[in-house]
Amino acid sequence: MATTKSVLVLIFMILATTSSTFATLGEMVTVLSTDGGGIKGIIPGIIPEFLEGQLQKMDNNADARLADYFDVIGGTSTGGLLTAMITTPNENNRPFAAAKDIVPFYFQHGPHIFNSSTGQFFGPKYDGKYLMQVLQEKLGETRVHQALTEVAISSFDIKTNKPVIFTKSNLAKSPELDAKMYDICYSTAAAPIYFPPHHFVTHTSNGATYEFNLVDGGVATVGDPALLSLSVATRLAQEDPAFSSIKSLDYKQMLLLSLGTGTNSEFDKTYTAEEAAKWGPLRWMLAIQQMTNAASSYMTDYYISTVFQARHSQNNYLRVQENALNGTTTEMDDASEANMELLVQVGETLLKKPVSKDSPETYEEALKRFAKLLSDRKKLRANKASY
């Protein structure tokens, strides 16, 4: 009798724990973030294609899209473009691009975007006209409020000297942020040196004109928007009743996938003090951009991984990054066929690499694990909504 009672108590405890685990999973906030990096966006473009393919298999749904699974999708520069592609609705209110369309987009349009050189020593390297043209064709008149999930796309206003973050959740307080997606995408991609800044206007709640003078979102996030995306997700969790159980900064109920565009920081291009002492302003400007992006990517990953580990939630954060780019693959604007093929190889090879030196798990295996969590969570939410 005592044994039977003990078994029943044990079963009850297991069921209670399982129920709690599923409840936690159902209320988990999911975040996808993609770095900036120009044509190197091909590298992270490989990752969403793999992940979306896994979700389609698990849910037996060829129409499954990443926007169906992530609460917040954010990016800067080329990552902002990727964000818009998978969250902007078509005429059927589905993402106008599947994840498998990302890499072909770069192959089709990259050579034209990075080909219209101004030929001027002073001024941007490219005129940006083709980039704006293709963004207008693809995104139409769609505005932020129409995005299929919460977005977080960064830019920097050189007139006000402040970052500008385009999100759906900010529109009630700041309706002037409800800009057209093509204006936002050009702005977040308008990297100093490469493209001209972008000027456009919207309107405030009282109808007054609101002016933007924007450059690349990497100026605001220094290339890695993961912290920004995580901040937007935290605010969403605090304001949305669906996530009422989540406390501020409770990373146990956050799932973050952060995609990098690759870095050569370990360390293809290094310098000595003797070499750098001979540099002029232009050489320093180019080197500082490279160093700053590499350092920011490392420090952002270090901070986020430390916080998740401190909360015993390290499996809820996955940073997918290639740290050993070399040759032409390090260039943001080499859109030659040969280099783009190399970038595809980098992305495909990355899937087979271990996540870290301390873990045998490959990125491919980690993404399958994330796909299972995303799939289960979506089903739990659907079941909860049906009651």
Curated annotation (Swiss-Prot):
Residues 32-230 form the PNPLA domain. A motif (GXSXG) lies at residues 75-79. A motif (GXGXXG) lies at residues 36-41. Residues 322-385 form a coiled coil. Glycans are attached at N115, N326. Patatin have a dual role as a somatic storage protein and as an enzyme involved in host resistance. This is Patatin-11. The lineage of its organism: Eukaryota, Viridiplantae, Streptophyta, Embryophyta, Tracheophyta.
